[in-house]
Swiss-Prot record:
The keyword S-adenosyl-L-methionine applies. It comes from Ectopseudomonas mendocina (strain ymp). This is Thiopurine S-methyltransferase. The keyword Methyltransferase applies. The lineage of its organism: Bacteria, Pseudomonadati, Pseudomonadota, Gammaproteobacteria, Pseudomonadales. Belongs to the class I-like SAM-binding methyltransferase superfamily. TPMT family.
Length: 219
């Protein structure tokens, strides 16, 4: 999947993956992670998610990474914020208050960029990527984040043969294969969310589960 795919989706406002509210799983499960106030939180492939502002509102410093500049600009405009813009290595960094959005390729992130990230939040990153890129994404995430990092991972699980992604199906077995060697994993919630999801219903899916995992990186 090429960068141009996502650039075009944002240019055409084909962003059905964007939620117009804070993710309910974030609201329910984040407080139980006991992430310290002031901790920096990495949010890969963040789009213009309202979750970014919510995390900042909890007293966290937020580091979002997003390929599409339009998504980054839209976030600050919709939040009524005027960001400072600076260049940092391969990234154009937009900063306002407690939120920094790094516009560029996630795979260009280095360990020193995220050395103080004590937490991770992935709602729409892993499931946005095809299989070969998911393996690379998980490996890169593991390589750059510090030990004792904790966070939430939210996936979709359905029969991939019935529908092309994105969003892609990511099974529990795949999550275990990507993360179990370096992270402690705990399934916090599994919900059947097929009802009302017209995009999936029209593909005649029989089941569609959202799954929430807690991740704790081993030191």
């Amino acid at each position: 999947m090429h960068e141009s795919f996502w650039q075009e989706r944002w240019a055409r406002d084909q962003i059905g993956f964007h939620l117009d509210q804070v993710n309910p799983y974030l609201l329910r499960h984040w407080p139980n992670l006991d992430v310290p106030a002031g901790a920096r939180v990495l949010v890969p492939l963040c789009g213009k998610s309202l979750d970014l502002a919510w995390l900042a509102g909890q007293g966290h410093r937020v580091l979002g990474v997003e390929l599409a500049e339009k998504a980054v600009q839209d976030f600050f405009a919709e939040q009524g914020l005027q960001p400072e813009i600076v260049q940092r290595g391969a990234f154009q960094v937009y900063r306002a208050g407690a939120v920094e959005l790094w516009c560029g390729d996630f795979f260009a992130l280095r360990p020193e960029d995220v050395a103080d990230c004590l937490a991770l939040y992935d709602r729409a990153a892993l499931i946005a990527l095809p299989p070969q890129m998911r393996e690379r994404y998980a490996a890169h995430l593991t390589a750059i984040l510090p030990g004792a990092c904790r966070g939430l991972l939210i996936t979709l699980d359905y029969l991939q043969s019935q529908m092309d992604g994105p969003p892609f199906a990511v099974s529990d077995g795949e999550v275990q294969a990507h993360f179990a060697a370096a992270w402690q994993l705990k399934t916090l919630q599994r919900e059947d969310v097929l009802a009302g999801n017209w995009k999936f219903i029209r593909h005649e899916l029989k089941a569609l589960d959202e799954v929430v995992y807690r991740l704790n990186k081993r030191e």
